[in-house]
């Protein structure tokens, strides 16, 4: 189980994620002794927390592997959940970033993503634009996926 604890607006909140089986994960939010549950019926490859939308409350950022309405091939996606009055609510259930998502990390409350381009890999920063994630800038490019993971300083999963 991965857990993060933050004090937000004088209330303690804690997002956790736990695997139930190979395709079911429980995302939980504990706020002042109460717990909210959101079931994710997809494999999870990454979990992080950050104040993505800048509202002063920590959000859960979950990488899932699934198909979407517009992209029917299963692939890696980014879902963002918020704390709404002590309940887990979707903030953004992304179907795609700019390119094919390989992995992501959180840097300065932004999503830093490795994406596959035609002949290389691109590391880009994405920030909240009021509706979803918008690319701020490309911060690194390489023909080597390992170089991109090293740049992100995360373990390949």
What is the predicted role of each segment?
Residues 10-157:
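Beta-propeller-forming repeat regions
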Residues 1-5:
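Bacterial N-terminal signal peptides
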């Amino acid at each position: 189980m991965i857990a993060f604890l933050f004090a937000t607006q004088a209330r303690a909140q804690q997002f956790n994620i736990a695997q139930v089986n190979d395709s079911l994960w429980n995302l939980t939010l504990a706020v002042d002794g109460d717990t909210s549950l959101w079931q994710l019926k997809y494999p999870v490859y990454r979990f992080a927390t950050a104040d993505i939308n800048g509202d002063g409350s920590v959000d859960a950022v979950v990488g899932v592997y699934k198909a979407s309405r517009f992209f029917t091939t299963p692939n890696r996606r980014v879902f963002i959940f918020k704390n709404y009055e002590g309940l887990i609510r979707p903030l953004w259930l992304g179907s795609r970033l700019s390119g094919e998502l390989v992995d992501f990390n959180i840097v300065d409350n932004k999503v830093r993503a490795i994406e596959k381009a035609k002949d290389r890999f691109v590391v880009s920063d994405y920030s909240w634009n009021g509706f979803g994630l918008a690319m701020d800038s490309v911060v690194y490019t390489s023909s080597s996926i390992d170089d991109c993971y090293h740049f992100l300083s995360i373990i390949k999963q």
